Design a protein with these regions (language model features):
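Hydrophobic alpha-helical membrane-interfacial segments at the cytosolic entry of transmembrane helices
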Residues: 18-30, 181, 214-241, 398-400
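Transmembrane alpha-helix segments characteristic
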Residues: 24, 119-135, 158, 178-181, ...
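Hydrophobic, aromatic-rich transmembrane alpha-helices
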Residues: 3-4, 97-116, 295-341
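Membrane-lumen/periplasm interface segments of specific transmembrane helices
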Residues: 35-38, 79, 206, 223-315
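Perimembrane helix-loop-helix junctions
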Residues: 6-16, 196-230
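Multi-pass, polyprenyl lipid-linked donor-dependent membrane glycosyltransferases
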Residues: 94, 137-164, 368-371
Length: 401
């Protein structure tokens, strides 16, 4: 492997000199930043213990009985275990977060540069630019990524790839492959992100609008990454089942109590209510709300959530987004406007709004998908505004770079 890497690196160095330099620069910075910043609060609680157990045992049934955190496994933990190496041991367990943030930065940057060189600056280019800035301002503390922020970075990538796919005049198998791969990875990070597989229907609608029914379905399922995506689904569901007896924890109707390692449905329901209570600001380190079942039902929790969580968690986040948009608008502003037609993204926006409502109603904490959903909706509309500015390619290149 090292010989092959050296051969292709030397052979293609001149053609990809700038890309290679950017790649190593990004990971050089991220590696040292991972040493500086503290680890996620849940790292010592269950991220590290679960990852370490995977390095010591091939298969353990019923891990969910040892620790509540073990009931929600993630592919992050399995990737962590791959970096348990001689001499280094467990000191590289933060590597998955470095890889996700590093490769995402590289992908975003290359997409922007490519569009500038091809003179194909559009609202997607601006969306990528805004996302690149956002993740490096709000998600720069690698040690605090856990499973949540890494997943949301991939959700941004997914939205970008969907925008690219629905903007194509002709459906493209390679673009579809990237979408399948991202959906599989996102779901593998946390099972409740299975909700984001709803985007598959959006893609199917796009395919069927270009192809006849039979041809469209064949194109949809014969893609190289369709089966790997299903494998990701099966693997994460299997890990949940082997830990708790549930296909998706803590969704009680997916649980089977007749296995020796299964968690009882009563306990699953109680924990689900607790997670919902916590995410709706009904509990914290120093307080517990009275009558939790009544509190989490309907919208009884909204007033307290606004008081305890919206101020100052969400409000500070939205203020940060506003400042980011003001700065970007200042750099790219032009008094000259161009006439643009609204792209065919109404269905995507509808899907995002549905996911936003589901997030707000069931688990309105930013770490549970709130960052990606809220920011994606805001950035799409702001990108359309930026795209209306009449800037020639030279001015755009100067302002971007």
């Amino acid at each position: 492997g090292l010989v092959s890497f050296y051969y292709y690196f030397k052979k293609n160095y001149r053609d990809f000199k700038s890309q290679i330099f950017n790649f190593f620069l990004i990971f050089f910075i991220l590696f040292f930043s991972s040493i500086i910043f503290k680890m996620h609060d849940d790292f010592s609680y269950y991220h590290f213990p679960y990852s370490f157990i995977l390095t010591q045992h091939n298969l353990v049934l019923g891990l969910g009985h040892l620790d509540l955190g073990f009931r929600t496994p993630s592919s992050i933990f399995f990737i962590n275990s791959l970096f348990y190496l001689p001499y280094i041991k467990f000191y590289m367990f933060m590597m998955p977060a470095i890889l996700i943030l590093g490769f995402s930065n590289n992908i975003f940057y290359e997409k922007i540069i490519k569009n500038i060189k091809l003179k194909k600056i559009n609202y997607i280019t601006y969306f990528v630019l805004l996302t690149l800035i956002f993740i490096n301002i709000f998600f720069y503390r690698i040690g605090e990524h856990g499973t949540d922020k890494s997943a949301q970075i991939l959700i941004f990538l997914l939205v970008i790839e969907i925008l690219i796919f629905i903007n194509l005049s002709k459906i493209n198998s390679q673009s579809l492959s990237r979408i399948y791969l991202l959906i599989g990875l996102i779901v593998s990070l946390k099972a409740f992100y299975v909700l984001y597989s709803v985007f598959i229907f959006l893609i199917l609608i796009k395919v069927l609008s270009k192809e006849k029914l039979v041809n469209g379905i064949i194109f949809f399922i014969k893609n190289t990454y369709f089966v790997p995506m299903l494998i990701f689904f099966i693997l994460i569901i299997s890990s949940y089942f082997l830990s708790t007896g549930c296909l998706i924890y803590p969704v009680s109707f997916t649980c089977f109590e007749n296995f020796s390692w299964s968690v009882s449905k009563i306990e699953v329901v109680e924990l689900n209510n607790w997670y919902e209570q916590w995410s709706k600001a009904g509990a914290g380190p120093d307080y517990r709300i009275d009558n939790p079942l009544e509190y989490i039902s309907g919208f009884n929790w909204v007033g307290n959530w606004i008081d305890k969580y919206f101020f100052n968690k969400v409000s500070d986040f939205l203020l940060g987004i506003l400042m980011l948009l003001i700065v970007v608008n200042t750099f790219l502003f032009s008094s000259k406007k161009k006439i643009i037609s609204f792209p065919n993204i109404k269905l995507l926006i509808t899907f995002l709004i549905i996911l936003l409502f589901e997030w707000f109603y069931n688990h309105p904490a930013l770490r549970y998908g709130g960052y990606a959903i809220i920011v994606s909706i805001i950035f799409i509309f702001f990108s359309l505004r930026l795209n209306s500015y009449s800037l020639d390619n030279v001015k755009i290149k100067k302002r971007f770079i």
